[in-house]
């Protein structure tokens, strides 16, 4: 079922919040839906047919080859000042074919939307792709982050908010255990006669302890993001969570 969602993006150093109202279907049957993108001007730009562009294309070729089999890869190409660092991550429950399909869409889209930027990121429901001229591996990305939520309100926001935070906190612990190499977890929680479904995930360049800090940070943004909303997400360049009142992901 199509539902009205709202995206709230917080760019670094922004004075005003940019709010975009969109109609979109973010259901289990549309895993490859485009979510958002950002092209960074901070790191400057490159020219067509330059060494930086060549290194960027090589990076994307490597990610396209490496990621589908494992769901994640991070790589660097070239030497300073034309080196490019990048990663790609597929949702933890995505099949290899779904992962590949998402990357085949996301990478050309990112190149088209950020044609000459030395840094950029794109999010789809099933994957994210990110590149930069600076080495960001192992660090929490505080710059790239946005909210997405259902505009419908729940009948008992106080209880719902508390149970949502409890579920996401529980999933964070599950995702950051020593044996969870995917840094990914899903689960469900009963709220009266209804069920709440949740997902958390980090990019795998982070250590478990850093992943936990990233997830705890965005879970702390629940009141600003999704207070009393039937569904919501905080999506960043290093970690994300999502919750819904319908089963958007397998939990077993």
Curated annotation (Swiss-Prot):
Pfam families: Stress-antifung
Reported effect, residue 190 to I: In strain: cv. Bretagny
Alphabetic keyword roster: Repeat, Secreted, Signal
GO cellular-component term (any): extracellular region
Sequence ranges assigned to domain Gnk2-homologous in this UniProt record: 34-136, 142-248
Outcome following mutation: residue 172 to A: In strain: cv. Bla-1 and cv. Bu-0
CDD domains: Gnk2-like
Leader sequence residues: 1-27
Gene Ontology BP annotations: response to abscisic acid
Transmembrane segments: none
InterPro entries: CRR_secretory_protein, GNK2, GNK2_sf
Subcellular location: Secreted
Organism taxonomic ancestry: Eukaryota, Viridiplantae, Streptophyta, Embryophyta, Tracheophyta
Protein name according to UniProt: Cysteine-rich repeat secretory protein 38
Impact upon substituting residue 191 to L: In strain: cv. Bla-1 and cv. Bu-0
Family listed: Belongs to the cysteine-rich repeat secretory protein family.
Originating gene: CRRSP38
